[in-house]
Every structure is written in structure tokens, then in C-alpha cells.
Amino acid sequence: DLLVQKFNRTVGQEKGVRVQVTNLSSASKIGGFLKEAQKGGRDAPEMPDLFTCHISDATALGSDNLVDWNARFTAEELSNFVPGFLADGMTEDGTLLLFPISKSTQLLMCNGSGFARFSQATGVSYADLSTWEGFYDAAGKFYDWSGGEAFCALDYPIRSVELNALEHGSGDFYTKNGWYDTNNVVFKESWMQFARSLAQGHVVVSDLYSNTQVMTGDVLSSLGSSAAILYYNDTVTYRDGTQEPMDLHVLPMPKTAGADALMAQAGVGLCAYKTTDQKAEAAALFVRWLTESERNLDFVAQTGYMPVRNGAFDAIENYDKFPEPTESYRQLYAALKIMQESYTPLSEPRFEGYYGKVSQLYD
């Protein structure tokens, strides 16, 4: 809302454009709100001109009813954005319905104090965690060394399984009804690698948020959203009440050795409802302003999200406005920059009902 106010006082005032926030909704509920507004009726909310949503919400409204950002931005302008982030907001025919403003991904966060003791005793290093093979091997060694404690809590294990399988060359492993083909040999082996580690107690599925389990010393590390950085403390408080510095270490998502690395991406984008050409141009003006490199980095750096412009990524190395604890944020964005440079972003599955099935799987 502060950014909207700043836009209205500056560029908006200069160009005769005013953005007004009319409704606030969670990402999980915005789709239903938009469909209700589109349907209309006496008690229906007013359809907003500009809104954030997921691509599945956008396509449900109908591509013909939405602004194609390709028509509002030149090819040269779009070339300045991370290609995979743009692709995440496109339909199959290339229509750009959702303009990216920020993206989160998954990576590894470790209790550095605890890892130092583990490393000294076993020789396992942070470098060993760069591959899935090394990650699962380290998890087994930690279990043995610690006397039966889990090494890592995973927030979205099925996504990790997917990335590992695709990096191993699984190809398409989705069925027509929007689930996983267990007859796909490569996908099945990726799943079994995780399942074996889970059954042996080397890793666990998180109790909602893996960062909590790291901060209480229940696990040594977490594999979850980059946005979890917001919730990490400077100290680890163990179950017996003892404390020590967290010394948080943030590492890129493990990848398959010798393969092209993939990374998850999540986050809503900006979508404009098609009404008048004047409103579409005003929406594009706001999106340009919001995604300018420096402003985009300032916007995301407080939350653990990734900027969407290549130029914003380039500025991370010398960025000096991270919140406290500064070193944790610095490590996070150094890891994100590595991933932006050498990993390919992968969109989440778009099957209807997919997320409900995933929730049932975790339960």
C-alpha cells in the first residue's frame, strides 16, 4: 500500500493515473473472489481493473477478458525480465496474462552452529549438500552420528521429487487426470529415494513450517520457501531450554549431479481486466514503475522473494539495505543469485484439483 501511495504521488500524479486499493485477499481465496465479481449480481463485489492472482485463476476468468501484457510491453522491454518468470504467467499460446512482480523458490537453510559440530565429526561439508545424492547421504550420516535425529524437514517434498526426476531425464510424468504416473521409472526412483530416507528417519515432512523445527533444534536444516527467511531467529532454542547462535547458512536447492539444474518458482503476478484501452495503458504504467530494477529489489529484499528483472539480480552483490539479521539475508540472496544464473525456473503444475491432492498426500 505504501508503494501504491508513492506511485500516486509521483509518476501517477504526473501522468494522471491513480491506483486505489479496493480489496485485500489471500492468494488462496483470490480466485473465488474474482469469479464472483465476474459473475456479477446484486451482492457481488466490483471487478477490479488490476489484481494479483495465480495463472490458474487468470485462465479461469478467460483469456479474452484479460489484457495481454505482450501488447503493452515491447520485446526489448520483456527481454530484461527473467524468461522463466514470464513463462509462468503465459498460456499455452503465449498470451502473457500474469506479469511477474516477485517470485519465491525453495532452498536449503541450515543451523550453522550445529552443522559445524557435525562437519567436524564426520567430514561432511556444505559442498556435499549441492547435489541430491550428497544431500541424502549427509542425511543418513547425520542420523547415525546424532543417535537417530532427522537431518532435514521438507515443506514441499513432492516438488523436490519432481525436480530430481526431471533432472534425471524422466520426461512427462503426469497422467491425464492431473496426478503422477507411478509407472514412470525415473519418477518412481526419485520418489523412492525420498521415501527411503523418510522411512529411515533421515528426513521428515515438516510440521507445517520447517523453519520452526530448525529453530527448536528438532532438525539441523530445512528445505522450504525462500520467504521463510522472515521467520528465522538469531538463536536456536533447544527443547531442554539451552540456546546457541543460529549462524544461519543458506544454500541453493540441491540438484542432480551432471544435469541441468531446475528450481521451483511460486508467487502471484499482476493481471489486468480488459475494459478500456486507457485503463490498460494505466495498468502497464504502474507495472513498469513497480518492476524498475532498484524498486523491484527494494520491494522483494524485505521478504525473501526474488526480483523479476535481470538488472535487479545484478545489483544484489552490492545491495546494502537488507533488514536484520543482515548476514542471513545476504546469504539468502547470494544463494538466489546463484540459482538465477545457473538454474532454470519451473512452473508449478496447473491441473485442476492438484493442490488438494497434494495436501491429502502430505496428510
Regions found by a protein language model. Give the residues of each.
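Short amphipathic alpha-helical coupling segments at ligand-binding clamshell hinges
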Residues: L3, E189-Q193, Q278-L290, K357
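Conserved N-terminal structural module of periplasmic/extracytoplasmic solute-binding proteins
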Residues: D1-A58
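Glycine-centered hinge/linker elements that transmit conformational signals in sensory
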Residues: Y136-G140, K176-L208, L248, M253
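Extracytoplasmic/periplasmic substrate-recognition and gating elements
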Residues: A199-H202, R239-G311
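Short, solvent-exposed loop/beta-turn-alpha elements that line the ligand-binding surface or hinge
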Residues: N70-F81, V124-D128, C152, G171-E189, ...
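Hinge/lid segment of periplasmic solute-binding proteins
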Residues: T52-L107, Y136, P245-P254
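C-terminal capping/gating helix-and-loop segments adjacent to ligand/active sites or protein-protein/ligand interfaces
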Residues: A264, T326-D363
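Extracytoplasmic/periplasmic solute-binding protein
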Residues: T95-I101, Q106, E133-Y180, V219-S221
